[in-house]
């Protein structure tokens, strides 16, 4: 039995399967990403800010949130979670090359290792941006869920300013990764790229999701609400959730029903 088939078999048993795989080289270094596979069914990546379990020193503050997603998804889906973006020394080695092309290559390598030829992607905030980049660069997405980020109309130059401001104060490689990433998107024409997407797609955000940092105001929920008709004409399912802010992803009891209402008719067979 080949390694890919072994992974599929292990996932079908319902237990988490933990595997480390070496991915594309960054200079003289290689990036190792830890990931876990749960459940059985169509493959679904839970991207950032959800990560694989037991991976952070001192415990994982998102463990209960991740479990809330897994409990509501693994009955019908093969859910893949991973430790990404890199942290610690891995982040130091990745700073110079952490652009959207490398990020997508890393994720596709994890998908290969997990035996997922095609997969749905759920990401929130930065994870939502990554989902847009995946949809623009590969035909392997079976569906896209872009949470906490507007698929069209976003100001990536403003995000580059915010990322630089945060990196100067944090003085950590993890923050510098985002500078590299968003600078690479400053000239990206999101509406032109998104208009070419063909996979089923959904976006959602909180109505009160507006972030003011470094003198920049990043409108997420209000912008999605304003562009709702445009997005729907482009084939998107759109949800704006009232009475919450950018931490909407921390409420799987609210988010997963939206995800299932979109994904189930698309990916599940009777």
Which residue ranges define each predicted feature?
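N-terminal export signals
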Residues: 5-23
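Conserved HGGG/HGGXW glycine-rich cap/lid loop of the alpha/beta-hydrolase fold
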Residues: 31-89
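Conserved acidic catalytic loop of the alpha/beta-hydrolase fold
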Residues: 102-119
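Conserved hydrolase catalytic core segment
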Residues: 118-152
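Flexible "cap/lid" loop of the alpha/beta hydrolase fold
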Residues: 144-166
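Short beta-strand/loop motif that positions the catalytic acidic residue
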Residues: 197, 203-205
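Conserved loop-alpha-helix segment in the C-terminal half of the alpha/beta-hydrolase fold
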Residues: 207-237
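Catalytic active-site module of serine/aspartate enzymes centered on a nucleophile-bearing elbow/loop
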Residues: 234-270
């Amino acid at each position: 039995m080949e390694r890919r088939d072994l992974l599929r078999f292990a996932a079908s048993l319902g237990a988490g399967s933990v595997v480390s795989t070496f991915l594309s080289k960054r200079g003289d270094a290689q990036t190792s990403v830890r990931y876990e596979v749960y459940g059985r069914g169509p493959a679904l990546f839970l991207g950032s800010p959800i990560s694989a379990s037991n991976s952070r020193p001192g415990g994982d503050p998102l463990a209960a949130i991740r479990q809330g997603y897994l409990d509501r998804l693994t009955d019908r889906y093969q859910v893949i979670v991973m430790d990404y973006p890199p942290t610690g020394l891995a982040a130091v080695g990745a700073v110079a090359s952490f652009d959207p092309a490398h990020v997508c290559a890393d994720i596709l390598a994890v998908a290969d290792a997990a035996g997922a030829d095609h997969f749905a992607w759920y990401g929130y905030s930065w994870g939502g941006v990554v989902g847009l980049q995946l949809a623009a660069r590969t035909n392997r997405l079976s569906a896209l869920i872009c949470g906490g980020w507007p698929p069209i109309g976003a100001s990536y130059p403003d995000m580059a300013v915010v990322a630089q401001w945060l990196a100067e104060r944090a003085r950590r490689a993890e923050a510098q990764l985002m500078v590299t990433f968003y600078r690479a998107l400053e000239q990206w024409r999101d509406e032109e790229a998104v208009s070419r997407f063909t996979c089923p797609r959904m976006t959602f955000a909180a109505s009160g999701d507006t972030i003011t940092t470094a003198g920049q105001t990043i409108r997420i929920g209000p912008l999605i609400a304003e562009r709702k008709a445009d997005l729907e004409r482009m084939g998107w399912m759109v949800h704006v959730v009232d009475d919450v802010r950018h931490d909407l992803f921390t409420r799987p009891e609210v988010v997963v029903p939206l995800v299932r209402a979109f994904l189930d008719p698309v990916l599940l067979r009777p």
